[in-house]
Amino acid sequence: AGCEASGLMAWESDPTENTRPFQIKLAARNGVTAALLAQDGFGGPAEIFDRAHSPLNAFSRNPTAERLTHQIGETWDGLMELAIKPYPCVAFLHPGLDALLELVDENDISADDVETLTIRFPKSGIHCIEDNPLKSHSAPYVLPVTLARRQLEIDDLFFDARNDDPKIAELCKKVEVVADEAELESLFPDFYATEIVVRLADGRTLSRRKDIARGY
């Protein structure tokens, strides 16, 4: 019930990962519901953002209501900041997933073929993906699952694939997360530039770099 409060970030400590997508969908549902109710004449406090018990006061010590209407109808920053994710995980991992899937498809790589799987990521953002208990934010989990299954689905985050698939569990042990302090770091945070390096059992080493998180 607590996680139904708009803007609450408690999902960061939810090991089930159910509440993160749940909250986003609630926001979308509530916006549509409010519009439909208003269309049918449903009433409410007209000064919802101006009174003492406004949502702005509930979530901020220094609310600035004027930002809600600043240049409204002239600029579309809110819309331009929306993202359409091709993968149900943190956006930091998206360029790496694009690179990994290209290598997997081009070389027909399976979990059994891999000796090591390395991701190079900007040092300033690596804390988010290196050893994160949330599966959706963990490179050592997301990359092996995506390689083994050639896709990443929301159920892969709700249910731990390591418990059901020994090959994925073993592959997770072969992941190395490396902090880049040079070129990739210089592009962060405007770009989530990532390099993926896959060392195969046949002696080949394959690499691919992607700089852009598609949909952002």
Q: What annotation goes with each model-predicted range?
A:
Residues 11-30, 36-216:
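Terminal-appendage/accessory-domain detector
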Residues 1-9:
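Long, well-ordered core segments of solenoidal/helical folds
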